[in-house]
UniProtKB/Swiss-Prot annotation:
InterPro entries referenced in this protein's UniProt entry, alphabetically: Chitinase_II/V-like_cat (IPR011583), Chitinase_insertion_sf (IPR029070), Glyco_hydro18_cat (IPR001223), Glycoside_hydrolase_SF (IPR017853), Glycosyl_Hydrlase_18 (IPR050314), IDGF (IPR015520)
Coiled-coil annotated residue ranges, if any: none
Protein name per its UniProtKB record: Bacteria-responsive protein 1
The species this protein was found in: Aedes aegypti (Yellowfever mosquito)
Lineage: Eukaryota, Metazoa, Ecdysozoa, Arthropoda, Hexapoda
Compartments in which it is found: Secreted
Amino acid sequence: MWFFKVGALLFLAALVSANNATTGPKVLCYYDGQMSLREGLGKITVTDIELALPFCTHLLYGFAGVNPETYRLKALDESLELDSGKGQYRLATTLKRRYPNLKVLLSVGGYKDLAEEKPFEKYLTLLESAGSRTAFVNSVYSTLKTYDFDGLDLAWQFPQTKPKRIRGWTGKVWHGFKKLFTGDSVLDPKADEHREEFTALVRDLKNALVADNFILGLTVLPHVNESIFMDVPLLKDNLDYVNLASFDQQTPERNPKEGDYTAPIYEPSERVEGNNVDAEASYWLKQGTPAGKIVIGIPTYGRGWKLVEKSGITGVPPIPADGPSIPGPHSGINGFYSWAEVCAKLPNPGNANLQGADQPLRKIGDPTRRFGAYAFRIPDENEEHGIWLSYEDPDTAGNKAAYVKAKGLGGISIFDLGNDDVRGACAGDKFPILRAAKYRL
């Protein structure tokens, strides 16, 4: 009899373990496949990200796009991603052979598929026709089956909200008074229709994918007003997760004259209301989304502004600035720095005595664990080499994971693996932001 009791207990323990593996915190890890096209140390291949995968529950390959004529899902670089070329889709999904618990999803949109004129038009036009939606859904199903993906991440592109200036109390009152006469600008004249049509698209996708157990998730991109474009009560039951990209709240492209925290957990004093992790998570919770479906995005990079004389010497944000700072040496994007590039600018034995553009930045941590870290270097007498940098590091990433755990949310997402310290150049550990966040869940 004892044998059967022990056997039953072991069976139950196995069931609990399997259930925990399925329902435990999600760690969604994005990989931008086009990073494999870079040169030098900025080149990040599928092989380079393998050491991160034991810490990820899902790998999201980004990004696919939409064909503007047929409204079918398309690879943004067929020669790189399809089997007829280098087959990078297949390289990503075959990782499951070595990491059998890993789910590999294809992400569509993500601000990678923008036309120069009317950048969001095809994503909105697709929604407006049942025939276009059907063509898209069918092409999604075909692509997932062909390349052995486990599901789809909808990083759908909607018109972005306009940048807002940071105003004090007096400025807010005056701005509100002016709006009585000028009114609000219209983001999308057909927003109500697009809201209903996006709900229909998600429902159609779910119906097409559910029989094959495909995962369907939604990523809410930065500067997308979900209260305008997303009917949360109708969407939530058709989604396996809702991933909130709660970062890039301020960027040097959108806010060139004002540097500030790019990804605070809570709202700093006298800032734009809602531009923080807690506000976005609270919105989805209040709309009835199960906490276990909400995933919080964590960037692996920083944003930099150029400082000038009028920026002052304190470095305290919000700080006057003059557009993006110079590009990082490997990412090559104005005002953008991977964590490895950020780390190289912070004080270390190798740069302690350097001057000019190589002089280390002054690092300001976040003892409150609410707003994030920043670093800066005031300009010299010629107004050169000044920089203000808001960034994510392992400590702040861990704070966000702790927030997720305390709130009982569904997990975290890493944007993205290629901008973490892939080679361990900073402190020897590879993927330190991912690791720090994972350990705090």
